[in-house]
Amino acid sequence: MITPQGMERLKEEHDHLWRVERPETTNKVSWAASLGDRSENADYHYNKKRLREIDRRLRHLRKCIDDFKIIDYHPHMDGKVSFGAWVEIENMEKALKKRLRIVGYEELIGNRDHISMDSPMAQALLDKTVGDEVMVKTPAAQFKWRINKIEYQK
């Protein structure tokens, strides 16, 4: 599962790798190969390795783009925590507030305010409503959180 915004980021990354990075790296490999002896040619070896990394990432992104199901906002989701929701929660004991978005694993990279739908926090929040209190059990401790607000990107 993935949000529409997450899918757009995957497509943008795929497009950038395919249209910009891969051609640049291929040109560097060709240039380095034209210098002759490849056995001690660091540019050649580095760029061949980089090309393999780009191709691996492109295959992964293509699989994700083809296989992931986009979960878009629907009015029936209002008032309840579901996949893709922005949830404002508050820990009354520590006077701590957080705003989190529940997403799939592929959307976590580079997003500090996103949590995996498989995380203990997300599992505790799913299907709850504003005003509900949830106990979140982690390996380190157990915390009580109250849901203050639920929003969806429409």
What positions do the PLM features span?
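Generic detector of short, locally flexible boundary/turn motifs and exposed helical patches
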Residues: R9-K11, L17, R50-R56, I65-D67, ...
